[in-house]
């Protein structure tokens, strides 16, 4: 099913139509890789948003607008960034992979000589150890044991790989690369990966991001040809829903997608962002979405030409954040309304 309906009543999801602005200079070092902000629960009074600028990783606390540098400067300009499971990790153009542990220890690894396009972090069910999945241009996903700083194994593919996501229960993984193919892996009790299905997103182009829903029922694939494919894990042959962005590629290429985080409660939302100016908040109960448009930052340029360098939910699902070159924009979710009327049958 392909739909392109827009929800005219933003109050279905949002408390504010005009976003708050926070000072954060975010930059991308690759025109296709624009998934460069992230957050996680740190146990602090408010959780930071991580972002990259040049060879540095920063974190901003939106409540106070305090900005802090994470660790030392890197030896590379990051293409990928993620904060999860207590870790913060960044990947580079020549196989570099740096991460900070929960104790702030910084580790540097050289994994290959190709781009590290995407990072996923999860804890294994077998021993609760944290491991990273790094999607690379050498046709592999590398599995790194973050507890010991060791490359544990490599999964091999027929194309450059761009992104992977692990389900919240740790039982399966989906990944995508420079083709329409979507690879579905089972993760067994010992932590090993087994390819179970290969399906195709509703695209003829490369895909750059994946996300798995809160209850592990759905997963989404964001593609370069301006399409977003949503699959039901029980029916992998074809997508159950396809959304198209507001414009054709390259401006309308979808560069990131994120389901409501596990700590957010039953909000049933999916955030996805184009490469320029427009993000969308999809209501999974109705299939309708709300456009989130970046405000004009420069009177000499069209608002439709502003780069988006990443988007994410707050860890508790209370807000969504979208990053431009100069600001982090925040829209607040109407959580009370969403949770008061939850849905147990999506779409």
From Swiss-Prot:
Which InterPro entries did the record assign?
DUF2415, WD40/YVTN_repeat-like_dom_sf
What's a single GO CC term here?
cytosol
Mainly resides where? cytoplasm
Keyword terms, alphabetized: Cytoplasm, Nucleus
* UniProt keyword annotation of Repeat present: no
UniProt keyword Nucleus, yes or no: yes
- One Pfam family this sequence matches: DUF2415
Q: Where in the cell is it found?
A: Cytoplasm; Nucleus
Protein name (Swiss-Prot/TrEMBL): Uncharacterized protein C4G3.03
What is the organism of origin for this protein?
A: Schizosaccharomyces pombe (strain 972 / ATCC 24843) (Fission yeast)
């Amino acid at each position: 099913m392909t739909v392109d309906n827009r929800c005219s009543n933003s109050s279905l999801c949002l408390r504010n139509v005009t976003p708050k602005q926070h000072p954060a200079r975010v930059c991308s070092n690759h025109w296709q890789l624009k998934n460069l902000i992230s957050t996680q629960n740190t146990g602090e009074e408010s959780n930071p948003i991580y972002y990259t600028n040049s060879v540095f990783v920063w974190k901003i606390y939106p409540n106070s607008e305090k900005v802090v540098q994470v660790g030392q400067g890197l030896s590379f300009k990051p293409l990928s960034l993620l904060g999860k499971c207590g870790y913060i990790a960044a990947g580079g153009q020549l196989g570099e992979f740096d991460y900070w542990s929960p104790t702030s220890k910084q580790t540097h690894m050289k994994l290959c000589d190709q781009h590290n396009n995407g990072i996923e972090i999860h804890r294994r069910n077998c021993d609760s150890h944290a491991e990273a999945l790094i999607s690379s241009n050498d046709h592999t996903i590398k599995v790194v044991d973050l507890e010991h700083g060791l490359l544990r194994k490599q999964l091999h593919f027929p194309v450059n790989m761009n992104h992977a996501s692990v389900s919240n229960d740790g039982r399966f993984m989906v990944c995508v690369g420079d083709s329409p193919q979507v690879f579905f892996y089972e993760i067994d009790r010992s932590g090993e990966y087994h390819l179970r299905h290969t399906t195709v997103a509703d695209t003829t182009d490369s895909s750059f991001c994946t996300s798995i829903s809160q209850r592990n029922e759905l997963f989404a694939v964001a593609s370069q040809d301006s399409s977003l494919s949503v699959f039901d894990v029980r029916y992998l042959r074809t997508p159950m829903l396809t959304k198209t962005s507001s414009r054709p590629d390259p401006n309308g290429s979808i560069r990131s997608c994120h389901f409501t985080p596990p700590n957010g409660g039953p909000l049933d939302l999916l955030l996805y962002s184009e490469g320029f100016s427009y993000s969308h908040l999809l209501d999974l109960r109705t299939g309708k979405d709300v456009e989130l448009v970046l405000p004009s930052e420069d009177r000499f340029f069209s608002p439709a030409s502003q780069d988006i360098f990443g988007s994410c939910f707050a860890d508790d699902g209370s807000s969504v954040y979208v990053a431009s070159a100069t600001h982090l924009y925040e829209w607040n979710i109407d959580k009370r309304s969403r949770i008061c009327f939850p849905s147990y049958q999506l779409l």
